[in-house]
Amino acid sequence: MNPLLILAFVGAAVAVPFDDDDKIVGGYTCEENSVPYQVSLNSGSHFCGGSLISEQWVVSAGHCYKPHIQVRLGEHNIEVLEGNEQFINAAKIIRHPKYNRIILNNDIMLIKLSTPAVINAHVSTISLPTAPPAAGTECLISGWGNTLSSGADYPDELQCLDAPVLTQAKCKASYPLKITSNMFCVGFLEGGKDSCQGDSGGPVVCNGQLQGIVSWGYGCAQKRRPGVYTKVYNYVDWIKDTIAANS
């Protein structure tokens, strides 16, 4: 994440005592089409990530909210038209009603696509979790965020990072009095690997289920400052109810 206090996968600045951080540091270039649920949120340029959870719905971070968003699916190199992309405007953008921009609690939003996505080898959905994330589970984090812990280098190609879920005790010890029951940590206490600016809103997938949303952190890939993620399991009912009410 940033050398400053930051939000670990955010695209636009947020007026909070954190700095936006939405990139992958210490990862690797994803194999093309290996993360078909990953989307890019665009408002003239990429600013956040997201995850396709049904043909017409995307989940992202609440701090990624903008009034007008184009969702770009099937992307790998976001600077090149590769022929597999689907660009679909948002019809509805619904941030969690209890989203708190100061502490980033309930950092989640849903985006309804104006037309359903075409599901194929390049674009597909990711399952919602059936149980909360267990400590020690290896997860895949992906995004087009900054790849440097100091300075800036934004990749054109989607980046991936394999990282473990940390215990809630280690998460709370890393950020005293800042971790709510709706947050969890993924990463390495020794630093060197993390999400960062530009990754915000993107997926944390563990055992084939969307367990996390890139939310915030202090800097990127700093020692004893792992990335903090929205715990999707806590919002499964809200997601299902919101989709049903807006179908």
Curated annotation (Swiss-Prot):
Keyword set includes Transferase: no
Source taxon at top rank: Eukaryota
Cysteine pairings via disulfide bonds: 48-64, 139-206, 171-185, 196-220
Name of one Pfam family that matches: Trypsin
Catalytic activity annotation: Preferential cleavage: Arg-|-Xaa, Lys-|-Xaa
PROSITE patterns: TRYPSIN_DOM, TRYPSIN_HIS, TRYPSIN_SER
Signal peptide region: 1-15
Peptidase S1 domain segment(s): 24-244
Compartments it resides in: Secreted
SUPFAM superfamilies for the chain: Trypsin-like serine proteases
Keyword Lipid metabolism: no
Gene3D superfamilies named among the record's database cross-references: Trypsin-like serine proteases (2.40.10.10)
Active site: 63 (charge relay system), 107 (charge relay system), 200 (charge relay system)
Site (Required for specificity): 194
Tissue expression from the record: Overexpressed in metastasing in non small cell lung tumors, leading to an enhanced cell migration.
GO cellular component, as recorded: extracellular space
Record key words, sorted: Calcium, Disulfide bond, Hydrolase, Metal-binding, Protease, Secreted, Serine protease, Signal, Zymogen
EC number: 3.4.21.4
Biological process, per Gene Ontology: endothelial cell migration; proteolysis
Binding-site residues for Ca(2+), renumbered to this chain: 75, 77, 80, 85
Role: May regulate cell migration.
Family membership: Belongs to the peptidase S1 family. Tryptase subfamily.
Protein name as catalogued: Putative trypsin-6
Annotated organism of origin: Homo sapiens
Gene: PRSS3P2
